Amino acid sequence: MKIAVYGKGGIGKSTTSCNISIALARRGKKVLQIGCDPKHDSTFTLTGFLIPTIIDTLQSKDYHYEDVWPEDVIYKGYGGVDCVEAGGPPAGAGCGGYVVGETVKLLKELNAFYEYDVILFDVLGDVVCGGFAAPLNYADYCIIITDNGFDALFAANRIAASVREKARTHPLRLAGLVGNRTSKRDLIDKYVEACPMPVLEVLPLIEDIRVSRVKGKTLFEMVETEKSLNYVCEFYLNIADQLLARPEGVVPNEVPDRELFSLLSDFYLNPVNTSNESTNSSIEANQEVESSFLII
């Protein structure tokens, strides 16, 4: 199974990807996570350091693939998850899609691409040009990471459009959305009502999820010394279980941009004000109590 993880920049894709990778490994699967970002920090919480990229390694070997060994590019991470960082071209030059293609080509040369039960591509931001949409060419499923915010859902909609386009020529399906670190999900529900797709999980606003990234650890590693975080790991295990069940997934029909803009902005500007309703109910109740005292 091959999974591509997308989402708005800074939404927590890498943190989520690393925890999902470990959750899949905990279910007995052999997992490889491939970071597809020039920052090459996708696997940081799995390995604890920034591992050398495939592009760096190929450059050092003058692009002689026959001189590259698996241990030159594949690093063992926490929980038995293998890690690869594709890297990227110099800033302002080259194409990220080419880098992803070279990464897959090298892994095939090393007979490593087909050795894993699950390969997870963690892809740069919400850039869905032909280059950074390249991992969708290899994926069985796409997962979109979002939160309950306007910008993240707008990006999710553009990614959904890319999935639909790639699904024309590849056996690709959208497995669903994952809400990350959000105290509410009303806007997520509003979006999936307009653009039907599964919601695999919504992780609550837990500060330890953000802190884990700073510590360079996954939640699964942190729970070894902080048992109170065990319940957080269950969210990722639930996502893993759904993926391993080989869901049918969907080919999404994205909402037109202007229509989505109106839908989401209207939800912000004209929210259902339940707080006012509850306040009015409290006032009415107090008035009834006061009246009863007057009668007595």
UniProtKB/Swiss-Prot annotation:
Cofactor(s) recorded for this entry are:
[4Fe-4S] cluster
Compartments annotated for it: namely: Plastid, Chloroplast
Source organism superkingdom:
Eukaryota
Q: Which reaction does it catalyse?
A: chlorophyllide a + oxidized 2[4Fe-4S]-[ferredoxin] + 2 ADP + 2 phosphate = protochlorophyllide a + reduced 2[4Fe-4S]-[ferredoxin] + 2 ATP + 2 H2O
Q: Which GO terms describe its biological process?
A: light-independent chlorophyll biosynthetic process; photosynthesis, dark reaction
Signal peptide span: none
Enumerate the residues binding ATP.
Answer: G10, I11, G12, K13, S14, T15, K39, N180, R181
Listed EC numbers: 1.3.7.7
The UniProt note on the cofactor reads as follows: Binds 1 [4Fe-4S] cluster per dimer.
Quick one: a GO cellular component term? chloroplast
Family affiliation? Belongs to the NifH/BchL/ChlL family.
Query: Briefly, what is this protein's role?
Result: Component of the dark-operative protochlorophyllide reductase (DPOR) that uses Mg-ATP and reduced ferredoxin to reduce ring D of protochlorophyllide (Pchlide) to form chlorophyllide a (Chlide). This reaction is light-independent. The L component serves as a unique electron donor to the NB-component of the complex, and binds Mg-ATP.
Name-wise, this protein is Light-independent protochlorophyllide reductase iron-sulfur ATP-binding protein
